[in-house]
Amino acid sequence: MGMPLPWALSLLLVLLPQTWGSETRPPLMYHLTAVSNPSTGLPSFWATGWLGPQQYLTYNSLRQEADPCGAWMWENQVSWYWEKETTDLKSKEQLFLEALKTLEKILNGTYTLQGLLGCELASDNSSVPTAVFALNGEEFMKFNPRIGNWTGEWPETEIVANLWMKQPDAARKESEFLLNSCPERLLGHLERGRRNLEWKEPPSMRLKARPGNSGSSVLTCAAFSFYPPELKFRFLRNGLASGSGNCSTGPNGDGSFHAWSLLEVKRGDEHHYQCQVEHEGLAQPLTVDLDSSARSSVPVVGIVLGLLLVVVAIAGGVLLWGRMRSGLPAPWLSLSGDDSGDLLPGGNLPPEAEPQGANAFPATS
Protein backbone atom coordinates (compact mmCIF):
# COMPACT_ATOMS: atom_id res chain seq x y z
CA MET A 1 0.00 0.00 0.00
CA GLY A 2 1.33 3.43 -0.89
CA MET A 3 1.35 6.66 1.07
CA PRO A 4 -2.11 8.22 1.58
CA LEU A 5 -3.11 11.18 -0.55
CA PRO A 6 -3.52 14.52 1.30
CA TRP A 7 -7.31 14.43 0.92
CA ALA A 8 -7.51 10.94 2.43
CA LEU A 9 -7.08 12.24 5.97
CA SER A 10 -10.01 14.65 5.61
CA LEU A 11 -12.20 11.81 4.37
CA LEU A 12 -11.05 9.56 7.22
CA LEU A 13 -11.79 12.24 9.81
CA VAL A 14 -15.34 12.58 8.51
CA LEU A 15 -16.16 8.90 8.02
CA LEU A 16 -14.47 7.30 11.02
CA PRO A 17 -17.14 6.12 13.48
CA GLN A 18 -17.08 7.93 16.80
CA THR A 19 -16.42 4.74 18.75
CA TRP A 20 -13.97 6.41 21.10
CA GLY A 21 -15.20 9.15 23.41
CA SER A 22 -12.86 12.13 23.73
CA GLU A 23 -12.30 11.30 27.39
CA THR A 24 -10.98 7.82 26.48
CA ARG A 25 -8.82 8.69 23.46
CA PRO A 26 -5.18 9.12 24.44
CA PRO A 27 -2.91 11.76 22.89
CA LEU A 28 -0.09 10.78 20.55
CA MET A 29 3.20 12.36 21.63
CA TYR A 30 6.81 12.12 20.50
CA HIS A 31 9.50 13.00 23.00
CA LEU A 32 12.81 13.93 21.34
CA THR A 33 16.20 14.43 23.01
CA ALA A 34 19.60 15.41 21.60
CA VAL A 35 22.75 15.86 23.68
CA SER A 36 26.14 17.42 23.06
CA ASN A 37 29.09 15.06 23.44
CA PRO A 38 27.20 11.97 24.63
CA SER A 39 28.95 9.50 26.89
CA THR A 40 30.68 6.58 25.18
CA GLY A 41 28.22 4.06 23.79
CA LEU A 42 25.18 6.29 24.19
CA PRO A 43 23.19 7.89 21.35
CA SER A 44 23.40 11.59 20.60
CA PHE A 45 19.70 11.60 19.70
CA TRP A 46 16.78 9.44 20.79
CA ALA A 47 13.03 9.53 20.57
CA THR A 48 10.12 7.75 22.17
CA GLY A 49 6.52 7.67 20.99
CA TRP A 50 3.64 7.58 23.46
CA LEU A 51 -0.07 6.83 23.28
CA GLY A 52 -1.15 8.35 26.56
CA PRO A 53 1.13 6.81 29.23
CA GLN A 54 1.91 3.78 27.04
CA GLN A 55 5.15 3.79 25.04
CA TYR A 56 4.68 2.39 21.54
CA LEU A 57 7.85 3.49 19.70
CA THR A 58 11.57 3.90 20.23
CA TYR A 59 14.30 5.34 17.99
CA ASN A 60 17.92 6.32 18.52
CA SER A 61 20.83 7.61 16.47
CA LEU A 62 22.83 4.39 16.91
CA ARG A 63 20.24 2.05 15.42
CA GLN A 64 18.49 4.65 13.22
CA GLU A 65 15.28 2.67 12.90
CA ALA A 66 11.91 3.29 14.51
CA ASP A 67 10.84 0.17 16.39
CA PRO A 68 7.47 -0.66 17.97
CA CYS A 69 7.26 -1.39 21.69
CA GLY A 70 5.19 -3.77 23.78
CA ALA A 71 1.87 -4.91 22.35
CA TRP A 72 2.32 -2.51 19.42
CA MET A 73 4.84 -4.94 17.94
CA TRP A 74 1.82 -7.01 16.88
CA GLU A 75 -0.27 -4.14 15.56
CA ASN A 76 -1.59 -4.81 12.06
CA GLN A 77 -0.02 -1.71 10.54
CA VAL A 78 0.17 -0.78 6.86
CA SER A 79 3.44 -1.81 5.21
CA TRP A 80 4.95 1.67 4.92
CA TYR A 81 4.17 2.86 8.46
CA TRP A 82 7.43 2.14 10.29
CA GLU A 83 9.49 3.26 7.31
CA LYS A 84 7.67 6.60 7.47
CA GLU A 85 8.27 6.87 11.22
CA THR A 86 11.98 6.18 10.63
CA THR A 87 12.23 8.78 7.86
CA ASP A 88 10.52 11.44 9.96
CA LEU A 89 12.69 10.77 13.01
CA LYS A 90 15.89 10.81 10.96
CA SER A 91 14.84 14.26 9.76
CA LYS A 92 14.24 15.37 13.36
CA GLU A 93 17.62 13.94 14.36
CA GLN A 94 19.34 16.02 11.70
CA LEU A 95 17.55 19.23 12.75
CA PHE A 96 18.28 18.72 16.44
CA LEU A 97 21.96 17.84 16.00
CA GLU A 98 22.53 20.76 13.63
CA ALA A 99 20.94 23.06 16.20
CA LEU A 100 23.29 21.76 18.90
CA LYS A 101 26.35 22.28 16.70
CA THR A 102 25.25 25.84 15.91
CA LEU A 103 24.65 26.66 19.58
CA GLU A 104 28.05 25.22 20.53
CA LYS A 105 29.76 27.22 17.80
CA ILE A 106 28.13 30.54 18.71
CA LEU A 107 27.74 30.27 22.49
CA ASN A 108 30.16 27.48 23.49
CA GLY A 109 29.19 25.02 26.22
CA THR A 110 27.27 21.75 26.02
CA TYR A 111 23.52 21.44 25.64
CA THR A 112 20.52 19.14 25.90
CA LEU A 113 17.85 20.01 23.32
CA GLN A 114 14.44 18.41 23.65
CA GLY A 115 11.05 18.54 22.00
CA LEU A 116 7.56 17.31 22.80
CA LEU A 117 5.54 17.06 19.58
CA GLY A 118 2.16 15.51 19.01
CA CYS A 119 -1.57 15.92 19.11
CA GLU A 120 -4.85 15.13 20.77
CA LEU A 121 -8.12 14.63 18.93
CA ALA A 122 -10.87 17.21 19.21
CA SER A 123 -14.52 16.09 19.22
CA ASP A 124 -14.57 16.34 15.41
CA ASN A 125 -11.30 14.30 15.14
CA SER A 126 -9.29 17.37 14.15
CA SER A 127 -5.85 17.95 15.66
CA VAL A 128 -5.16 19.80 18.89
CA PRO A 129 -1.38 20.11 18.39
CA THR A 130 1.49 20.30 20.88
CA ALA A 131 4.95 21.54 19.87
CA VAL A 132 7.21 22.77 22.66
CA PHE A 133 10.99 22.69 23.04
CA ALA A 134 13.43 22.87 25.95
CA LEU A 135 17.10 23.71 26.27
CA ASN A 136 19.01 22.30 29.24
CA GLY A 137 15.78 21.46 31.01
CA GLU A 138 13.95 24.76 30.52
CA GLU A 139 11.24 25.45 27.97
CA PHE A 140 12.48 28.06 25.53
CA MET A 141 10.55 27.74 22.28
CA LYS A 142 7.19 26.83 20.74
CA PHE A 143 6.06 26.12 17.21
CA ASN A 144 2.78 27.46 15.82
CA PRO A 145 1.69 25.06 13.06
CA ARG A 146 -0.99 27.39 11.72
CA ILE A 147 1.45 30.26 11.24
CA GLY A 148 4.49 28.09 10.62
CA ASN A 149 7.11 29.64 12.89
CA TRP A 150 9.16 28.95 16.02
CA THR A 151 8.95 31.60 18.72
CA GLY A 152 10.35 32.32 22.17
CA GLU A 153 12.07 34.99 24.22
CA TRP A 154 15.52 33.47 24.69
CA PRO A 155 18.52 34.53 22.56
CA GLU A 156 18.98 30.81 21.85
CA THR A 157 15.46 30.70 20.42
CA GLU A 158 16.41 33.12 17.69
CA ILE A 159 19.50 31.08 16.83
CA VAL A 160 17.62 27.79 16.54
CA ALA A 161 14.53 29.28 14.88
CA ASN A 162 16.59 31.08 12.23
CA LEU A 163 18.56 27.90 11.52
CA TRP A 164 15.44 25.78 11.11
CA MET A 165 13.60 28.39 9.03
CA LYS A 166 16.49 28.23 6.56
CA GLN A 167 16.00 24.49 6.10
CA PRO A 168 13.96 23.72 2.97
CA ASP A 169 10.33 22.97 3.89
CA ALA A 170 11.14 22.43 7.60
CA ALA A 171 8.32 24.66 8.85
CA ARG A 172 5.86 23.32 6.27
CA LYS A 173 6.68 19.71 7.16
CA GLU A 174 6.31 20.46 10.88
CA SER A 175 2.89 22.01 10.30
CA GLU A 176 1.83 19.15 8.05
CA PHE A 177 2.83 16.63 10.69
CA LEU A 178 1.08 18.36 13.60
CA LEU A 179 -2.16 19.17 11.79
CA ASN A 180 -2.53 16.18 9.45
CA SER A 181 -0.08 13.29 9.89
CA CYS A 182 -0.31 13.16 13.68
CA PRO A 183 -4.11 12.83 13.92
CA GLU A 184 -4.05 10.36 11.02
CA ARG A 185 -1.53 8.18 12.86
CA LEU A 186 -3.45 8.46 16.11
CA LEU A 187 -6.72 7.45 14.47
CA GLY A 188 -4.94 4.57 12.75
CA HIS A 189 -3.56 3.29 16.04
CA LEU A 190 -6.96 3.52 17.69
CA GLU A 191 -8.61 1.60 14.85
CA ARG A 192 -5.95 -1.10 14.36
CA GLY A 193 -4.56 -1.41 17.85
CA ARG A 194 -7.23 -0.36 20.30
CA ARG A 195 -6.86 -3.66 22.15
CA ASN A 196 -3.21 -2.81 22.75
CA LEU A 197 -4.32 -0.03 25.07
CA GLU A 198 -5.82 -2.78 27.23
CA TRP A 199 -2.69 -4.95 26.98
CA LYS A 200 -1.90 -7.00 30.09
CA GLU A 201 1.32 -8.98 30.52
CA PRO A 202 1.81 -10.84 33.84
CA PRO A 203 5.19 -10.64 35.60
CA SER A 204 7.88 -13.23 36.13
CA MET A 205 9.32 -13.17 39.66
CA ARG A 206 12.42 -14.03 41.67
CA LEU A 207 13.28 -13.73 45.38
CA LYS A 208 16.95 -13.49 46.40
CA ALA A 209 18.85 -12.74 49.63
CA ARG A 210 22.19 -11.05 50.30
CA PRO A 211 24.08 -10.14 53.49
CA GLY A 212 23.12 -6.81 55.01
CA ASN A 213 24.58 -4.79 57.86
CA SER A 214 24.80 -5.66 61.56
CA GLY A 215 23.67 -9.25 61.30
CA SER A 216 20.83 -8.64 58.88
CA SER A 217 19.98 -9.90 55.40
CA VAL A 218 18.33 -8.00 52.57
CA LEU A 219 15.63 -9.74 50.55
CA THR A 220 15.17 -8.59 46.97
CA CYS A 221 11.91 -9.47 45.27
CA ALA A 222 12.12 -8.76 41.54
CA ALA A 223 9.34 -8.75 38.96
CA PHE A 224 10.09 -8.72 35.23
CA SER A 225 8.44 -7.97 31.89
CA PHE A 226 4.96 -6.95 32.95
CA TYR A 227 2.34 -4.43 31.83
CA PRO A 228 0.58 -2.27 32.94
CA PRO A 229 3.18 -0.83 35.34
CA GLU A 230 0.95 -0.86 38.43
CA LEU A 231 2.06 -3.76 40.61
CA LYS A 232 1.75 -4.43 44.35
CA PHE A 233 4.46 -6.22 46.35
CA ARG A 234 3.86 -8.05 49.61
CA PHE A 235 6.36 -9.97 51.74
CA LEU A 236 5.01 -12.93 53.71
CA ARG A 237 6.61 -14.39 56.84
CA ASN A 238 5.36 -17.88 57.59
CA GLY A 239 2.39 -17.07 55.37
CA LEU A 240 1.47 -13.81 57.13
CA ALA A 241 1.83 -10.31 55.65
CA SER A 242 5.10 -8.65 56.69
CA GLY A 243 5.13 -5.37 54.77
CA SER A 244 5.78 -4.31 51.18
CA GLY A 245 9.42 -3.23 51.46
CA ASN A 246 11.03 -0.37 49.55
CA CYS A 247 9.80 -0.53 45.94
CA SER A 248 11.05 0.81 42.61
CA THR A 249 9.55 0.50 39.11
CA GLY A 250 10.93 1.37 35.69
CA PRO A 251 10.47 0.74 31.95
CA ASN A 252 12.44 -1.89 30.03
CA GLY A 253 12.46 -0.03 26.74
CA ASP A 254 10.28 -2.61 24.98
CA GLY A 255 7.00 -1.37 26.44
CA SER A 256 7.04 -3.66 29.46
CA PHE A 257 8.26 -2.86 32.98
CA HIS A 258 10.44 -4.24 35.76
CA ALA A 259 10.23 -3.65 39.50
CA TRP A 260 11.81 -4.76 42.73
CA SER A 261 11.28 -4.41 46.44
CA LEU A 262 13.84 -4.65 49.24
CA LEU A 263 13.19 -5.85 52.79
CA GLU A 264 15.74 -6.09 55.60
CA VAL A 265 15.30 -9.16 57.82
CA LYS A 266 17.19 -10.96 60.59
CA ARG A 267 20.05 -13.06 59.22
CA GLY A 268 19.16 -16.75 59.29
CA ASP A 269 15.47 -15.90 59.04
CA GLU A 270 15.42 -15.59 55.23
CA HIS A 271 13.74 -18.92 54.46
CA HIS A 272 10.72 -17.99 56.52
CA TYR A 273 9.86 -15.39 53.86
CA GLN A 274 8.03 -15.43 50.56
CA CYS A 275 7.25 -12.63 48.12
CA GLN A 276 3.85 -12.09 46.56
CA VAL A 277 2.67 -9.70 43.85
CA GLU A 278 -0.73 -8.60 42.65
CA HIS A 279 -1.09 -7.46 39.05
CA GLU A 280 -3.87 -6.94 36.51
CA GLY A 281 -2.37 -9.66 34.30
CA LEU A 282 -2.69 -12.27 37.05
CA ALA A 283 -5.91 -14.10 37.85
CA GLN A 284 -4.67 -14.42 41.44
CA PRO A 285 -1.63 -13.22 43.42
CA LEU A 286 1.67 -14.84 42.40
CA THR A 287 3.88 -16.08 45.26
CA VAL A 288 7.53 -17.10 45.07
CA ASP A 289 9.86 -18.70 47.65
CA LEU A 290 13.44 -17.70 48.36
CA ASP A 291 15.92 -18.66 45.61
CA SER A 292 13.17 -19.83 43.29
CA SER A 293 11.34 -18.16 40.48
CA ALA A 294 7.91 -18.08 38.93
CA ARG A 295 7.78 -18.17 35.12
CA SER A 296 11.52 -17.48 34.94
CA SER A 297 14.70 -19.57 35.00
CA VAL A 298 17.25 -16.83 34.18
CA PRO A 299 19.37 -15.53 37.10
CA VAL A 300 18.15 -12.20 38.42
CA VAL A 301 21.45 -10.48 37.65
CA GLY A 302 21.28 -11.58 34.03
CA ILE A 303 17.72 -10.38 33.63
CA VAL A 304 18.38 -7.01 35.22
CA LEU A 305 21.51 -6.49 33.13
CA GLY A 306 19.51 -7.37 30.03
CA LEU A 307 16.96 -4.76 31.03
CA LEU A 308 19.74 -2.24 31.53
CA LEU A 309 21.11 -2.92 28.06
CA VAL A 310 17.66 -2.36 26.57
CA VAL A 311 17.23 0.88 28.48
CA VAL A 312 20.58 2.10 27.14
CA ALA A 313 18.99 2.04 23.69
CA ILE A 314 16.42 4.59 24.85
CA ALA A 315 18.46 6.42 27.47
CA GLY A 316 16.33 8.47 29.79
CA GLY A 317 13.35 6.15 29.64
CA VAL A 318 12.97 5.87 33.41
CA LEU A 319 12.83 9.61 33.98
CA LEU A 320 10.62 10.18 30.97
CA TRP A 321 8.15 7.45 31.92
CA GLY A 322 7.86 8.83 35.43
CA ARG A 323 7.04 12.28 34.14
CA MET A 324 4.54 11.02 31.56
CA ARG A 325 2.79 8.86 34.16
CA SER A 326 2.58 11.84 36.52
CA GLY A 327 0.80 13.93 33.91
CA LEU A 328 3.36 16.73 34.12
CA PRO A 329 3.33 19.17 31.22
CA ALA A 330 6.70 18.22 29.75
CA PRO A 331 9.36 15.72 30.87
CA TRP A 332 12.41 17.91 30.39
CA LEU A 333 15.90 16.81 31.42
CA SER A 334 18.57 19.28 32.48
CA LEU A 335 21.58 17.03 31.95
CA SER A 336 24.30 17.80 29.42
CA GLY A 337 25.82 15.23 27.11
CA ASP A 338 28.68 14.52 29.51
CA ASP A 339 26.12 13.56 32.15
CA SER A 340 23.91 11.46 29.89
CA GLY A 341 25.05 8.26 31.59
CA ASP A 342 23.08 9.44 34.62
CA LEU A 343 19.92 9.01 32.56
CA LEU A 344 20.33 5.27 32.98
CA PRO A 345 18.88 3.44 35.99
CA GLY A 346 22.12 1.83 37.13
CA GLY A 347 22.09 3.73 40.43
CA ASN A 348 18.69 2.27 41.19
CA LEU A 349 19.58 -1.37 40.59
CA PRO A 350 19.41 -3.67 43.61
CA PRO A 351 22.96 -4.41 44.88
CA GLU A 352 23.05 -8.05 43.74
CA ALA A 353 22.23 -6.90 40.20
CA GLU A 354 25.16 -4.51 39.88
CA PRO A 355 27.52 -5.61 37.06
CA GLN A 356 30.85 -6.94 38.36
CA GLY A 357 32.63 -6.98 35.03
CA ALA A 358 32.15 -6.95 31.29
CA ASN A 359 31.87 -10.74 31.10
CA ALA A 360 30.07 -11.36 34.38
CA PHE A 361 26.60 -11.85 32.93
CA PRO A 362 25.02 -13.25 29.78
CA ALA A 363 24.79 -10.78 26.94
CA THR A 364 21.63 -9.92 25.06
CA SER A 365 21.32 -9.17 21.39
From Swiss-Prot:
- Return the annotated region ranges for Alpha-2: 111-200
Q: Where is this region: Connecting peptide?
A: 291-297
| This protein's UniProt keywords | Cell membrane, Disulfide bond, Endosome, Glycoprotein, IgG-binding protein, Immunoglobulin domain, Membrane, Phosphoprotein, Receptor, Signal, Transmembrane, Transmembrane helix
Its GO CC terms are: endosome membrane; plasma membrane
What name goes with this protein?
IgG receptor FcRn large subunit p51
**Side of membrane Extracellular, spans:** 22-297
What residue ranges are annotated as transmembrane?
Answer: 298-321
In this entry, the parts of the chain located on the Cytoplasmic side of the membrane are 322-365
* Role description: Cell surface receptor that transfers passive humoral immunity from the mother to the newborn. Binds to the Fc region of monomeric immunoglobulin gamma and mediates its selective uptake from milk. IgG in the milk is bound at the apical surface of the intestinal epithelium. The resultant FcRn-IgG complexes are transcytosed across the intestinal epithelium and IgG is released from FcRn into blood or tissue fluids. Throughout life, contributes to effective humoral immunity by recycling IgG and extending its half-life in the circulation.
Glycan attachment points? 108, 125, 149, 246
Residue span of region Alpha-1 = 22-110
Q: Where is this region: Alpha-3?
A: 201-290
State which gene encodes it. Fcgrt
Q: Name the family the entry cites.
A: Belongs to the immunoglobulin superfamily.
Q: How does it sit in the membrane?
A: Single-pass type I membrane protein
List Phosphoserine occurrences by residue.
Answer: 334
What organism is the protein native to? Mus musculus
Signal peptide residue numbers: 1-21
Region annotated Disordered sits at 343-365
Q: Which residues form the Ig-like C1-type domain?
A: 202-289
